[in-house]
Amino acid sequence: MESLRAHRLLALVRGKDPAAALRTVTTLAEEGIAAVEVSLTTTDALTVIERARAELGPDALIGAGTVRTPADAARAVDAGASCLVTPAVVDGLAGIGVPVLMGALTPTEIERALALGGAAIKLFPASLGGPDYLSALRSPFPDGRFVHVDIVPAPGSPCSPRTAGPSGSTAVRTARACRGMT
């Protein structure tokens, strides 16, 4: 979590070509993007994580995203993931050995994610509430660490959600912790 907080950017890699996904992860690292999340929806995602870990070393922040079950989490950690990102609240991840950014949107989901040991709450989809919603959440959850997640496409980029094709493209998104990073 400290590394993510320091770098303020988490690149998301998702696609159907595992070789391209691995090249994307290593290229991002070479270009100074210190934290990369490989979505488990990527074809052969665990192999991509494993190979990226072998190429980039033990200090690289390589996360597994779209973790939906404890079995997903265990396989991702075994492959070398140094953090997990879930799209929703997932039971059974306490004690997994790596930080978990747990997806939540409503106060009920946030309370549950915190009770389950989420290192941070991935406010997703953050665009539904915006800054006012986040400010409102800070009142009942003053100790909660929130990660605001949005897609940040370049104009005309294949990363744009409007132009991302079914072949699977690389998307880059920011993960800005809204507590302790601003």
Language-model region placement:
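Conserved N-terminal beta1-alpha1 strand-loop-helix module at the mouth
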Residues: 1-82, 143-146, 153, 162, ...
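Hydrophobic positions in alpha-helices of CheY-like receiver
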Residues: 52, 56, 93-97, 137, ...
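Catalytic cores of alpha/beta
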Residues: 69-79, 94, 108-117, 133, ...
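A generic structural signal for well-ordered alpha-helical segments
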Residues: 4, 28, 93-97, 113
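Glycine/Thr-rich beta-alpha phosphate-binding loop at enzyme active sites
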Residues: 33-38, 77-79, 98, 106-134, ...
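A cross-domain feature marking catalytic cores of carbohydrate-active enzymes
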Residues: 13, 38-40, 64-66, 88, ...
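Glycine-rich phosphate-binding active-site loops on the catalytic face of alpha/beta enzymes
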Residues: 83-93, 122-131, 153-158, 162-182
